[in-house]
């Protein structure tokens, strides 16, 4: 995979930079967490500093046909403008014709950078038919002379702007964000100091099964929390009440428990939980994990203490998936306790994107408190499952 260090520019031709500005916004369109925009700055500023005219491409959310309201990248263009000190025009390019060349030229002559409107406004971007995606890529390709992918969070997709468009260029490279992400994953794969602890939470075991199978032989401790823990508790004969439970995966949970025992991997489950009658309950009660009556929505204080001690005794920690329903303050203490333990740890601490990265900001922590916070949710998991990311394979 070629990186920006070996990247050469075409004479005067713009460079496509596929960024990932898929950031969370509130109901009035205000960005609530701009990690992904800030993470793109090293690549953008480096290319601008080297005199390259830039055409940025990104997606935002999952707009459906003829439903564009709430999915405009305008707030992202405005936030990026604040960071780089240059006005970043937002260009609506739904009509890919010769008129666009003139508009792009005017903007690039003035600012040196533009942001195309949400690429997912084209249905072809996410089409399952490769022929459709290739048509969109062929329409886009003439507007630039080179291609840089810095959208790690979208690189597990076979979408037109990260897969087919990259194949349209011989002069292409990965940006600094992707390079940084891959270095962090390389550290986990080949340089992880021991004890090596993995914490997995989130809703479903089925979403993390392949990940667990791939990493279990390489770790010393596996801490399980979130909704997926209840399938493991049920496998051990515990009463899980109305908690999230995947009964069809209980046998898989038993296999994982047996494998951990046979390979001296310490598998640690919650010993107490915070349970409540509903997801919106204003208050939960502490219960032993083996006898839950209602819904387990967070790990309890004893489990928090156990997990904290394990983290303090670790040299490498990877965490993906919140410990509970952290969006509700009543059930955020478990996730907060893990963040607090990790932020004060001397270990290499890796936060695995998605909801886990969102919790960092929401619960008042700083991304700099951790060794690495990934910008990719699905991309992060697929790498740890041992998969090759399609968009990186074609660079």
Curated annotation (Swiss-Prot):
Subcellular location(s) of the protein: Cytoplasm
Main location as per UniProt? cytoplasm
Q: Which InterPro entries match?
A: Phosphoglycerate_kinase, Phosphoglycerate_kinase_N, Phosphoglycerate_kinase_sf
Listed binding positions for substrate are: 20-22, 36, 59-62, 120, 157
Q: Which SUPFAM superfamilies match?
A: Phosphoglycerate kinase
Its Enzyme Commission number(s) read: 2.7.2.3
Provide the reaction this enzyme catalyses. Answer: (2R)-3-phosphoglycerate + ATP = (2R)-3-phospho-glyceroyl phosphate + ADP
An MF annotation (GO) of this entry: ADP binding
Associated pathway: Carbohydrate degradation; glycolysis; pyruvate from D-glyceraldehyde 3-phosphate: step 2/5
Keyword field contains ATP-binding: yes
Keyword ATP-binding attributed: yes
The top EC class is transferase
Pfam families named among the record's database cross-references: PGK
Q: Any idea which UniProt keywords this protein has? A: ATP-binding, Cytoplasm, Glycolysis, Kinase, Nucleotide-binding, Transferase
GO biological process terms on file: gluconeogenesis; glycolytic process
Q: Name one GO cellular component term.
A: cytosol
Q: Where does ATP bind?
A: 208, 296, 327, 353-356
Q: What do we know about how this protein assembles, alone or with others? A: Monomer.
Q: Output the HAMAP family linked to this UniProt entry.
A: Phosphoglyc_kinase
Family to which the UniProt record says this protein belongs: Belongs to the phosphoglycerate kinase family.
Name listed for the protein in its UniProt record: Phosphoglycerate kinase
The organism's taxonomy opens as:
Bacteria, Bacillati, Actinomycetota, Actinomycetes, Micrococcales
